[in-house]
């Protein structure tokens, strides 16, 4: 997820920001983003009025309100080794930062819309911010059950926000929500089939969680449709290519490098990464004008070559390091240029 302000580490006991010794303080150093808020305030809802009103009512209904029981215990169900405990807690910290940063971005967009007199759009993004805050709250409670307090309100004091054009923000937000949906739902399905791997009750909330992520992606898709120029012609193809490629590349590197978390749940990280990418690429046909063509299998096959090259570069030194970097860059650029397929995504205007 993205947001509009900068970062700070977590609070263990109050006053001083720090994580327990077995966790890396860099877990709480995400990037935050700002965008063209004045341009966003000019979003033309007239071309999408019927769909917007239907989506507004769905978000207003807050179907998952009762599913997130604030009184539910989030104490771990199983004792974990010190190593597995650190793996689980690291996942919680990364996730709470991601959800809270999403809340910050949606809240800022909401405030800017309302300030510009676009009350409907402002309330629309308030609903999205509500969901992200709820998710962050549950993750924060799960961390407290581990004896860790994350000072969320102070996650925004050190790093200056990075500016992205509105089109970049919408493309990346759509993918962030949809890839999140597939991650949560696939983990949920796996744990339903393998209940002995459920080490904490937090995972019981992944089904309503993924429903929120899916709806958020649909909301962002609606916003993209209100800006037809973002998805037309060469610009639309280039934006589709760049964001699908960059999000999938990042997912492969992070999932496979953090395979210990998936191992804790009994999930093969390589197969999980592949399924998430395939499903997200397919889902993106509903929003993007172009998606990657996976029919020949080349995109997916290159993932392991890229991962190996990345690890070689990271582990190399001296004169070997630039050579390893060159090979890594060559591979990812070849993957970037692989064939795409035109979609039949609904467009307005």
Curated annotation (Swiss-Prot):
EC numbers: 1.14.13.81
GO MF terms held by the record: iron ion binding; magnesium-protoporphyrin IX monomethyl ester (oxidative) cyclase activity
Region (Disordered): 1-23
Pathway(s): Porphyrin-containing compound metabolism; chlorophyll biosynthesis (light-independent)
SUPFAM superfamilies: Ferritin-like
EC class name: oxidoreductase
Organism: Prochlorococcus marinus (strain MIT 9303)
Pfam families, alphabetized: Rubrerythrin
Annotated family: Belongs to the AcsF family.
Cofactor list: Fe cation
Catalyzed reactions per annotation: Mg-protoporphyrin IX 13-monomethyl ester + 3 NADPH + 3 O2 + 2 H(+) = 3,8-divinyl protochlorophyllide a + 3 NADP(+) + 5 H2O
Function: Catalyzes the formation of the isocyclic ring in chlorophyll biosynthesis. Mediates the cyclase reaction, which results in the formation of divinylprotochlorophyllide (Pchlide) characteristic of all chlorophylls from magnesium-protoporphyrin IX 13-monomethyl ester (MgPMME).
Listed name of the protein: Magnesium-protoporphyrin IX monomethyl ester [oxidative] cyclase
Biased composition (Low complexity): 1-10
Alphabetic keyword roster: Chlorophyll biosynthesis, Iron, Metal-binding, NADP, Oxidoreductase, Photosynthesis
One of the GO BP terms on file: photosynthesis
